[in-house]
Curated annotation (Swiss-Prot):
PANTHER family: CHROMOSOME TRANSMISSION FIDELITY FACTOR 18, DNA LIGASE
GO CC list: cytosol
Protein name: DNA ligase
Signal sequence coordinates: none
InterPro entries: BRCT_dom (IPR001357), BRCT_dom_sf (IPR036420), DisA/LigA_HHH (IPR041663), DNA_ligase (IPR001679), DNA_ligase_AS (IPR018239), DNA_ligase_CS (IPR033136), DNAligase_adenylation (IPR013839), DNAligase_N (IPR013840)
UniProt catalytic activity: NAD(+) + (deoxyribonucleotide)n-3'-hydroxyl + 5'-phospho-(deoxyribonucleotide)m = (deoxyribonucleotide)n+m + AMP + beta-nicotinamide D-nucleotide
Organism (species): Haemophilus influenzae (strain PittGG)
CDD domains for this protein: BRCT_DNA_ligase_like, LIGANc
Lineage: superkingdom: Bacteria
Keywords: DNA damage, DNA repair, DNA replication, Ligase, Magnesium, Manganese, Metal-binding, NAD, Zinc
Purpose: DNA ligase that catalyzes the formation of phosphodiester linkages between 5'-phosphoryl and 3'-hydroxyl groups in double-stranded DNA using NAD as a coenzyme and as the energy source for the reaction. It is essential for DNA replication and repair of damaged DNA.
Length: 670
């Protein structure tokens, strides 16, 4: 063997080991960059020395020419289906049949239990350790030749990881697409105006049956082995579980959830455990496969028709069903998001009766090409809200009606706007819309907004539920009699709440802007808006170009602000707030280049009386300062409010400049 051949063999062996660690053990020993480096090194050597290229090289997963069609492969050992059980009673009957048939009955019966993967069954033949042929299950006797496509699946070894491979070994398993890969695939398809897949199983099937293996290579497919067909030149373990572990040891991936269970009760416990974990597995399963573990007992039990007597699929309740779309209603969420909800002919899916399903947004309606009256496929997985995943367009009736997305909010009649680049359309009546009322009011009274002590979430809930308030302005119209009629609201608590409301009328423009709850407008942005426009009227009248002159206000935020002020309902509520006495003094802040704090480290301590701590922090950051939470020798200034404690003492000890709140305000305002 030449030095080049030795180098090639060593590279291939190393890369196969890394692939095994990554795809089978899920425990890579090297970073991806090291694998990539060796892979490219191998590829370059093979290009220089094509006479030494082998079909089982890690570089040869992709590269076959597109096929004109699939040839047929006859299975030497038929790929049988399984009988199904749909209840504990049916499973127990299966166990009873086994017990009645066995001459010497072991106590207890041991089962190898596996999740039933929702993918496609395949057969992969290795000759002297090299992947030689792969086929679909087909009708059990004959399948399609998918060798070129199977070679592209990253966790399928092209050569078995053993120095003593069997002469012939047929691995049987399921090819599927994990949820994460499925979502990436559909996202890419949407971005490139390509057809999307209804579910991961369809995506896996479509990918495996691609005539062009280069396309299959870009699909995130995975194999999990579940058994062995042909085995020549090897002494196999005597139990099903040990055979799967042996497959894993030679590089074939198996499912990590496989478990040995003794007796029917343990098996049923496994079934329920997997059912509970179903939504968090990261891939689709539709039940469990339960097999007698002892191979000798399997052989004794034998087969009936097209199924083994020693195994059964205990299926979960169906997750997908067909039903009719009777109507579509548009709901308004607490943040103003408009969600189309399908009203369905009730249908039993995954253990519950489903009559509603989400349609997500306008894009989804368009993608599905769905109309009222259509026959639709409903899917319910775990605790996930039922959704429509497909439409049987060939069943569309002549009287089907198109779904029209509303232009005005179905709750408050405010305009509905969809910002470019966003999937969700929203009601613009944030201060007025009843659907958004509770959240808008809770935000309005919060500490960082109007800071109304004594008026918390529970009180807001009561006031809204009893229809005593509808907008933030109504808070300032409350009286003692109204409040004392509420649950857990005595005279003292009511007086405190009213005093807090009265005190809150004196605020700052920045706090007021933040309290309005304009989407994407946080504390710092509100402060920037107040400093830039100086008055509420100037902000209200600003156009998009003027809004984008404000620091940290880009196109999206500018759109949010502009749309808010163009909705008449919002303007009416703001005017009502001013009429109720909400006011502020104009405080004009110096530009960053003119102030003392640019590029300085500042610590805030104690209670500030004229603004909140976060407001002061945002203001300092706007002026170019770094705000720290602790005092050190690197601190330039400490701003001390009332009841300043250890930070003030440490600043004095380190001879750091200390400013009172009044001195701080004098430094930053003109």
């Amino acid at each position: 063997m030449t030095n080049i051949q030795t180098q090639l063999d060593n590279l291939r062996k190393t890369l196969r080991q890394y692939e095994y660690e990554y795809h089978v053990l899920d425990n890579p020993s090297v970073p991806d960059s090291e694998y990539d480096r060796l892979f490219h090194q191998l590829k370059a050597l093979e290009l220089e020395h094509p006479e030494f290229l082998t079909s089982d090289s890690p570089t040869q997963r992709v590269g076959a020419k597109p096929l004109s069609g699939f040839s047929q492969i006859r299975h030497e050992i038929p790929m049988l289906s399984l009988d199904n059980a749909f209840s504990d009673t049916e499973f127990n009957a299966f166990v009873k049949r086994i017990e009645d048939r066995l001459i010497l009955l072991p106590k207890p019966l041991t089962f190898c239990c596996e999740p039933k993967l929702d993918g496609l069954a395949v057969s992969i033949l290795y000759v002297n350790g090299v992947l030689t042929q792969a086929a679909t299950r087909g009708d059990g006797s004959t399948g399609e030749d998918i060798t070129a496509n199977i070679r592209t699946i990253r966790n399928v070894p092209l050569q078995l990881l053993t120095d003593n491979p069997p002469a012939r070994l047929e691995v049987r398993g399921e090819v599927f697409m994990p949820h994460a890969g499925f979502e990436r695939l559909n996202k890419y398809a949407l971005e490139h105006n390509e057809k999307t897949f209804a579910n991961p199983r369809n995506a896996a099937a479509g990918s495996l049956r691609q005539l062009d293996p280069n396309i299959t290579s870009k699909r995130p497919l995975v194999l999990n082995a579940y058994g062995i067909g042909i085995a020549e030149g090897v002494d196999l373990p005597t139990t099903h579980y040990d055979r799967l572990q042996w497959l894993k040891s030679i590089g074939i991936p198996v499912n990590p959830e496989i478990r040995l269970c003794n007796g029917a009760d343990e098996v049923l416990g496994f079934y329920r455990d997997i059912q509970n974990k179903r939504s968090s597995l990261g891939y689709d399963i539709d039940g469990t496969v339960l097999k007698i573990n002892d191979i000798a007992l399997q052989n004794e039990l034998g087969f009936i028709s097209k199924a083994p007597r020693w195994a059964i699929a205990y299926k979960f309740p169906a997750q997908e069903e067909l039903t009719l779309l009777n109507d579509v209603e548009f709901q308004v969420g607490r943040t103003g998001a408009i969600t189309p909800v399908a009203k369905l002919e009730p249908v039993f899916v995954a253990g519950v009766t489903v009559s509603n399903a989400t349609l997500h947004n306008g894009d989804e309606i368009e993608r599905l090409n769905i109309a009222i009256g259509d026959t639709v496929v409903i899917r319910r997985a775990g605790d996930v809200i039922p959704q429509i995943i497909g439409v049987l367009h060939e069943r569309r009736p002549d009287n089907a009606k198109p779904i029209i997305f509303p232009t005005n909010c179905p709750v408050c009649d405010s305009q509905i706007i969809r910002i470019e680049g966003e999937a969700v359309a929203r009601c613009t009546g944030g201060l007025f819309c009843a659907a958004q009322r509770k959240e808008a009011l809770k935000h309005f009274v919060s500490r960082k907004a109007m800071d109304i002590d004594g008026v918390g979430g529970k009180l807001i809930e009561q006031l809204v539920d009893r229809e005593l308030i509808h907008t933030p302005a109504d808070l300032f119209k409350l009286d003692l009699t109204t409040l004392t009629r509420l649950e857990r609201m005595g005279a003292k608590s009511a007086e405190n709440a009213l005093n807090s409301l009265e005190n809150a009328k004196s605020t700052t423009l920045a706090r007021f802007i933040f309290a309005l709850g304009i989407r994407e407008v946080g504390e710092a942005t509100a402060l920037n808006l107040a400093n830039h426009f100086k008055t509420l009227d100037a902000l209200k009248d600003a156009n998009l170009e003027e809004l984008q002159q404000v620091p940290d206000v880009g196109e999206v935020v500018a759109n949010r602000i502009f749309i808010f002020w163009r909705e008449a309902h919002n303007v009416a509520v703001v005017e009502d707030l001013i009429a109720q006495g909400v006011h502020w003094e104009t405080v004009e802040v110096k530009e960053a280049s003119e102030n003392l704090f640019k590029d300085k480290t500042v610590v805030l301590t104690g209670t500030l009386t004229q603004m909140g701590r976060n407001e002061a922090k945002a203001l300092l950051q706007q002026l170019g300062a770094k705000v720290s939470g602790s005092v050190s020798s690197k601190t330039d200034f400490v701003i001390a409010g009332d009841a300043a404690g250890s930070k003030l003492a440490k600043a004095q000890e380190l001879n750091i400049t200390v400013l009172t709140e009044e001195e701080f305000l004098a430094q930053i305002t003109r």
